[in-house]
């Protein structure tokens, strides 16, 4: 499985690496709206990895993102490396 995709969702998990590890920032994003209504057996999770970065300002658990990039399957989870991203703010009522 490999292809270009545009996805949006909320960051559910952030991987913190030891200082001695090769720098990369990895998070898991879940499409919460789809997850709530879907009954298709899929988990609607996407791993995002930025190579060479220890953190990305503004991207943390709870942040809503729209991402674009190539998706491949790694360790059973769809993964996007160095995606383009847009932080989506919470709409005020």
Question: What are the residue ranges of the model-derived segments?
Answer:
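OB-fold/S1-family single-stranded nucleic acid-binding modules
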Residues: 68-93
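Well-ordered beta-strand positions in beta-sheet-rich domains
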Residues: 8, 43-47, 77-79
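Hydrophobic core residues within well-ordered beta-strands of beta-rich domains
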Residues: 5-7, 25, 65
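A short beta-strand motif that forms part of the nucleic acid-binding face
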Residues: 31, 52, 63, 71, ...
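OB-fold (S1/OB) nucleic-acid-binding surfaces
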Residues: 14-48
């Amino acid at each position: 499985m490999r292809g270009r995709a545009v996805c949006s969702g909320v960051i559910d998990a952030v991987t913190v690496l030891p200082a001695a590890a090769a720098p990369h920032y990895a998070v898991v994003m879940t499409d919460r709206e789809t997850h709530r209504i879907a009954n298709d057996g899929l988990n609607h999770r996407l791993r995002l990895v930025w190579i060479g970065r220890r953190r990305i300002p503004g991207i943390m658990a709870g942040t809503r993102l729209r991402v674009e990039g190539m998706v491949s399957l790694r360790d059973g989870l769809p993964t996007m490396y160095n995606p383009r991203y847009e932080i989506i703010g919470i709409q005020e009522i």
